[in-house]
Regions:
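Short glycine-rich anion-binding loops that position phosphate/pyrophosphate groups of nucleotides
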Residues: 1-8, 36, 66, 107-111, ...
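Short, glycine-/small-residue-rich phosphate/pyrophosphate-handling segment
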Residues: 27-65, 73-88, 227-263
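Glycine-rich phosphate/diphosphate-binding loop of Rossmann-like nucleotide-binding domains
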Residues: 47, 51-52, 94-164
Length: 314
């Protein structure tokens, strides 16, 4: 980590050791991750050096709060390895989405039936998290509407946690008018059970079985796609089971037409090692101009990157 002395050397333009000499000679993006005693970090001299570096375009990954190596409590802990990695990736990534406002829906929804049971699906939110992260790395301002159990997102992504399809619809609808791009990757329940009530349904009253009625939920993708303003672009997703990728593409063609998405990605959730809860997807992708591609067993991170690049140019 960058010590108080290292910050002083960098701010003063020193070239007295390998680190300061390399930093002074380097004309690319410079990231500095300090860690030190909390009183050293708060000292006016250190803060002046930090301000000087920031004015020169250096990105400072400010230390976190907690117990430091000397045993004192306060701001001085090195940021996590995940934060360091994301900051480095962002510095190296093309900023071709800078200035764009992006909304991503991700994860499942849970439709309650009684006090303990609900209707849902096994979506993990990993595909949507990959989309949100990729857009943020490429410079976009990202709003993520997250169903239950979604993975962590970069601190720079604004997260909106919801539970039901209705809540996801309302959250997405409230954000959509200000967005430039939307990726609707959430596995939203198409139907909700008509609620039994807040109490737990007891099996003793249904020894011969029972029936549950369902009501339709809002179609988030279609509603927001049809209601978009000029210039907005829509990336839709379809979780499907199909015997092969050609059959999946047939399903995608029909769904893209119904949803009026600029780009639609069909996900073969029954493909081995792909789909819900995995790190890979097999996709059939189609845009509004009729261009089609099939991607087999690719990482969700790679899929996310490619989908944004495609949506930008469609």
């Amino acid at each position: 980590p960058a010590s108080a002395d290292a910050l002083a050397r960098l701010a003063g333009g020193r070239a007295c050791d390998m680190l300061s000499a390399q930093a002074l000679a380097f004309d690319g993006p410079l990231l500095v991750a300090p860690a030190m005693n909390p009183r050293m970090w708060a000292h006016a001299a250190t803060q002046d050096n930090v301000a000087t570096l920031r004015r020169r375009g250096v990105r400072i990954l400010a230390p976190g709060n907690g117990s430091t190596a000397c045993g004192d409590q306060g701001q001085g802990r090195l940021v996590s390895s995940d934060e360091l990695l994301l900051a480095c990736l962002q510095a190296l990534a093309p900023q071709d989405m800078a200035g764009l406002r992006v909304m991503v829906t991700l994860g499942p929804t849970r439709e309650p039936w009684d006090g303990v049971r609900f209707w849902s699906n096994p979506s993990s939110g990993r595909m949507g998290a990959a989309l949100a992260t990729a857009a943020w790395l490429r410079g976009a301002t990202v709003e993520a509407v997250c169903g239950p159990g979604c993975p962590p997102l970069p601190d720079g992504v604004r997260r909106h946690d919801v539970r039901t399809a209705r809540e996801m619809f309302e959250a997405a609808q409230s954000l959509w008018s200000e967005m430039d791009l939307g990726a609707f990757s959430a596995a939203v329940a198409d139907f909700s059970p008509v609620p039994y009530g807040e109490a737990k349904f007891k099996k003793e009253g249904a020894s011969d079985g029972f029936s549950v009625s369902f009501a339709s939920n809002p179609d988030i993708l279609r509603t927001l796609s049809l209601g978009r303003r000029e210039g907005q672009k829509v990336l839709g997703f379809a979780a499907e089971t199909a015997p092969d990728m050609d059959a999946l593409m047939t399903l995608v063609r029909g769904k893209r037409q119904r949803k009026q998405a600029d780009l639609l990605a069909g996900n073969a959730v029954n493909a081995p090692g792909c789909g819900f809860g995995t790190d890979s997807n097999s996709m059939a992708v189609l845009d509004k101009n009729g261009h089609e591609e099939i991607w087999t067993s690719q990482s969700k991170a790679d899929v996310a990157w490619k989908l944004w690049s495609w949506l930008l140019r469609v």
